[in-house]
Structure formats: C-alpha cells, structure tokens
Amino acid sequence: MSAFTPASEVLLRHSDDFEQSRILFAGDLQDDLPARLDTAASRAHTQQFHHWQVLSRQMGDNARFSLVATANDVADCDTLIYYWPKNKPEAQFQLMNLLSLLPVGTDIFVVGENRSGVRIAEQMLADYAPLNKVDSARRCGLYFGRLEKQPVFDANKFWGEYSVDGLTVKTLPGVFSRDGLDVGSQLLLSTLTPHTKGKVLDVGCGAGVLSVAFARHSPKIRLTLCDVSAPAVEASRATLATNGVEGEVFASNVFSEVKGRFDMIISNPPFHDGMQTSLDAAQTLIRGAVRHLNSGGELRIVANAFLPYPDVLDETFGFHEVIAQTGRFKVYRAIMTRQAKKG
C-alpha cells in the first residue's frame, strides 16, 4: 500500500497546512498516508480490518479498528480528515460518531472522489460543521469546515433488518446487501444441500445471511464466519443471535485470523474495495483455501460471470466445476484432492 489514492494526492497539495495539526484520519482509508503525512500527531480510526492491518504496522496503537470510535480514539486531536466512502449511510454513521466525540472548534476536512457522492457532505454536515469546497483535483473534492455543534450519536438507531424465507437478517450501514438478499447469494444458497454436516467457514460473511440460511436446513453444521468489516461482524453476530443459530464470528482479512481446517468454505467474495475494483480478496480466498480445507473438503463461491476466477481455481485445485449459473452469476465448486496445491 504505497501508491496514494487520488483523494490522498489532493490532500498532499495542502501538506504544509497539516504540519502543526493533531490529526484523526477516518473513513475509507485506502492507503497509508495517515502514517506518512508530516503532522504534529496522527491517529487513525477504521471499520476495515485490512486497512487497520496496514496502518497499525506503522502507527501502532494510534491506529484503531472498531465499529464505533470512542473518546480514547480521538484524544487530543484538533483536526479530522475524513475520506468519503461510496456508501452515504456508512458516512453518516461514521461522521456522526466522530463529530459527537471531537471538541467544538475542531477543523473538519472531507475528501473523496466526485463519483462517490462526496458533495453530499455539505448537506450532511450543514447543522454541525458547515463546509466549503477548498480544492478540486484528480476528480476529487476537498471540503473544509469547523465543528460548531456536536451531534447526538446513537449507534442503535442505525440498525436495520429484513426477512428472507422466515429468517431475520440484521444489518448496519456499510454491510454488503444491506437492504435485501442479493442475487448472487440467492444463487449460492440454491445450491446448498440440506442435512450437510461438518465445519463450515463463511468468508466475507456480510450480514450472516448465507450462514443462517444454511444452518436452518443443515442444523448439524458448525459455523465460523469472518469479514474485514466491523459492521459486518456485528451484523452477523446479531443475525445469528436473532435466529438462534450458534457460530463464531470475528474480523479477518480473508484467512489472516482463521485457524484450522474446514469441510466446506462458502463465500460471495467482494470485488470492490471502496470505489476501486479489486480481485485480490477473491484470489487470496481461492489460493488460501487449500490451507484451510480438509481432504475432500469443498470451496463453493459465487461470482460475477465475467470475473477471471476459473483460471485461479484450476491453477490451485487442478479443476473446478460450475454448478449453477445465470446470465450474470456463476457458482463455482472445487474439491480438495491430491491434485490441489497444498499452499
């Protein structure tokens, strides 16, 4: 993570302005500028575990990962630099949380790509920190204001839920498929066999819908769920609890925190990281699966039909099969045999 994003490049045009500032970086932190910008002091708060991994290596305890920031996370900061995500409710959750903790008078900078909808920040913060656009470059906007009034923040008000075949799915801003079951997951679910047994790992679990739906018709499976997103981890825990399903849920960058082997790994892997297209997570998932599958175990994933996963599956497992497809999606299946590279 050495190349800077367009948003960071815009901030670097103003680097002299930040040398005396005690800065909290937050939002969609796609690079390590928070660790490298010359400031009086720097902290970072992120809801993304993989971003925290990169930043914590350079910033130590000054980089924090959690769903909700606390007073300790913003201590002594006089400036907020917020990277706008592509998801407006996610931005609202994070900004209301952070502005409720920062003292009145804090300098507020919001930066983001124009296509992400960053201009909405002016409207969102109008009652708390009126913003003005201070720069426009690299197809990004940079906005500045000063905190005049702290909002009241209640994380519980951001919870949502929807029903799928009698199951209740709990969601939070920033969780994939927040408003209903996506078509890809639906296709993957249609391929799962009732009365399955064994240890199942759900990678990139989102709100936990794949796991609870699987557990309903295969109650003897033992579930482990992981995701890079703090909102997803909390949403999955809530979804499991609401539906009376047991399982372990934790934050992990694909397999980074996963221990042991499983009889089945299921996933609807992401191919976007913020505004950027990224196949890294899915390729890491496929290549790393052989280190976490028992002999005869199975990797089953759903993906957009145009994505180049068949080659990686064949290279890793020796073969693959397509067990369901629509015009847009394919469900791939690969079995752990002697042909598979053992990683």
From Swiss-Prot:
Cellular compartments annotated: Cytoplasm
One GO term describing the cellular component: cytoplasm
Molecular function terms from GO: 16S rRNA (guanine(1207)-N(2))-methyltransferase activity; nucleic acid binding
EC number: 2.1.1.172
Keyword Chaperone attributed: no
Keyword Thylakoid part of the UniProt annotation: no
InterPro entries (UniProt xref): DNA_methylase_N6_adenine_CS, Mtase_sm_N, rRNA_ssu_MeTfrase_C, RsmC/RlmG, SAM-dependent_MTases_sf, Small_mtfrase_dom
CDD domains: AdoMet_MTases
Catalyses which reaction(s): guanosine(1207) in 16S rRNA + S-adenosyl-L-methionine = N(2)-methylguanosine(1207) in 16S rRNA + S-adenosyl-L-homocysteine + H(+)
Keywords: Cytoplasm, Methyltransferase, rRNA processing, S-adenosyl-L-methionine, Transferase
Known role: Specifically methylates the guanine in position 1207 of 16S rRNA in the 30S particle.
Quaternary organization: Monomer.
Family: Belongs to the methyltransferase superfamily. RsmC family.
Protein's recorded name: Ribosomal RNA small subunit methyltransferase C
